[in-house]
C-alpha cells in the first residue's frame, strides 16, 4: 500500500516514545510532519528551561528521521483549559488529574485542530494505546504493554477526537521502543521518561502549589473531632495518604479519610483496613465515551479509579447523559476529582469524574 499521499502530523515531545512513533510512521512510508507543542513556560530548580531542552531533542530527532517540523505555542490554551481547572479542583478540596484534561483539551483538541488545518489526514502521538477501526467506528484499546498502558489518560476522548488518530507504539513493549531508538541512534534513545505532572516536572509539588493557591494551616482531627495535629493546607493531602501527617503515638498508622472545607480540618482514621477508607459506590459527572454505540441505561464493565490500579468489576447506571452511579466491590481510597475509567475487556469505554463516594448508603467524608 502506498502511504506517501497520507499526511500524518506527529506530536513530538522530545521523548523516546514520540520519537519512535515518528520513526515508525516514516518507515511505513507516510508523509510525516513533526509538531512540538509548548504548553507551559517552565524553568526547573537549576534555572534550566526544560521545554527548551525537549525542543532541542525533538529537532534532533526530526533531523535524524528526515521529517519537517514546526513548533506551536499552546500556553494560553493550556492555562485557560487545563491549569485553571487544576487549581479550581484543588480549591474544592479535590484531587484532579490534569493529564486527562490535557489530552482532552490540548493534544486532541487544540493540537488536533491545528494539524487538520495543516492538511493532516491523521495525527499521531507516542501514547501506549491502540486504535481499532471497524464498521461501527473507531475503538480505543489498551496498549499491549500492561505496565505502560495510557488509556486511563485518554478516556475522556470522543469518537470525533480519536477517529483520525494513530498510536504507533501501542503495539509495542516499552523495552522494544527503547531498542528501536538505540538501533537507529535517535537522540532520545537513553533519555529518561518524564515523571509527574507536566507543568511541575521533578519539582516539589507542595512548593509549586503554594505559588498559586494560598495555603491555610488547620487542625488534623480524628473521626470523633479530637485534635491530633496540624496540617499546612488541605490541598496538600489526598484520601488514603499516610506519609507526612506528623502523627505519632501508639497503635496502627493514621490515614487521611476526609476533608472538611468549612472548618479547614483534615480528618484521619487509624488502621489501613479502616472501613472509612473503603467505598463501594460513587457518583460521577462529565461522562464521555469514544464508542458510537453504548447502552445509555446501564452496563457491566471493569473500572479503574486511579492509574495502574487493577481492574475492578463494576456496574454503571446512567442518571442522565453525563451523570452516572457506579457500584463496585469494596475499594480503598477512591478520590473525588479523579477519573473513574470503564473497560470492556481491551476496549476503553470512557470515563467520568468522581464527585461523591459512598459505602452503601453512607457518604464518606471526602
Swiss-Prot record:
The active site is at 102 (nucleophile), 198 (cysteine persulfide intermediate). Disulfide bonds join 102-198. ATP binds at residues 11-18, 37, 126. CDD domains: MnmA_TRMU-like. It comes from the Bacteria. Residues 97-99 are annotated as: Interaction with target base in tRNA. Its EC number is 2.8.1.13. Keywords: ATP-binding, Cytoplasm, Disulfide bond, Nucleotide-binding, RNA-binding, Transferase, tRNA processing, tRNA-binding. It is found in: Cytoplasm. GO terms for molecular function: ATP binding; tRNA binding; tRNA-uridine 2-sulfurtransferase activity. One of its GO terms (cellular component) is cytoplasm. It is an enzyme of class 2 (transferase). InterPro entries: MnmA-like, MnmA-like_C, MnmA-like_central, MnmA-like_central_sf, Rossmann-like_a/b/a_fold. The record marks 127, 338 as: Interaction with tRNA. Residues 148-150, 306-307 are annotated as: Interaction with tRNA. It catalyses: S-sulfanyl-L-cysteinyl-[protein] + uridine(34) in tRNA + AH2 + ATP = 2-thiouridine(34) in tRNA + L-cysteinyl-[protein] + A + AMP + diphosphate + H(+). Pfam families: tRNA_Me_trans, tRNA_Me_trans_C, tRNA_Me_trans_M. Catalyzes the 2-thiolation of uridine at the wobble position (U34) of tRNA, leading to the formation of s(2)U34. HAMAP family: tRNA_thiouridyl_MnmA (MF_00144). Belongs to the MnmA/TRMU family. This is tRNA-specific 2-thiouridylase MnmA.
